[in-house]
Amino acid sequence: MSENETRERQLRQEIIRVGQLMYARGLLCGFEGNLSARLDGERLLITPSGLHKGLMREEQLLVVDLDGRVLVAATDGARPLRPTSELPMHLEAYRRRPDVAAVVHAHPPITVALSIAGVPMDTPLLPEVIVLLGLIPTTAYAMSSSDEGAAAIRDLIAEHDALILQRHGTLTVGATLTEAFMRLETVEQNARIHFMLAQLAAERPLPAAEVAKLLRLRRAMGLERPGDAATFQAQWGVEPD
């Protein structure tokens, strides 16, 4: 087996594993969600449309190019499989983020509920969220499974590793599928804490001076994204270094 074949086999296994984790953690159900990973500079491995992500098999994943053309097809029995209907959103993320090697779209229920209720989730509450993700913005509403989804993330994904998709779910990216999955978990945990605090009427944002310290740590860890300083200053009065 060649090095490229070995890498593809490993990525297929990782997509299956992460899909099972997402289902087990209640971050999607039914046919929801989709995952992809870069095979190389020209090709992506991506999940099919219409299959349960907790029950997929390695051979049911497809290979597409960066224009969305299917290079390696797959079937479910006799039924030909198509790439996820959210393929345009995945392609847009890769175009805007050449540093990214994996994209995960999920439907975490608390995050979705709060986005429908209009509860903002970019309040600086949890130190670990600030360090790992910065602010988590919410996109404008876009019809799912359409080119609108790609347009909705276009500008935001360039500066953020995690987005909340209005009424739809989340999009997280990473250097690996595991990293993108962990960022998804962090988004849902952040939403869970926001929800609990709303019940207690006790939301208390971190002081600007403490946020500034956390942003310095984020920078030192190599996690800073373009626009971090300007965004935190504009929204929360955090003075940049």
Describe the predicted segments one by one.
Residues 1-241:
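Glycine-rich flexible loops
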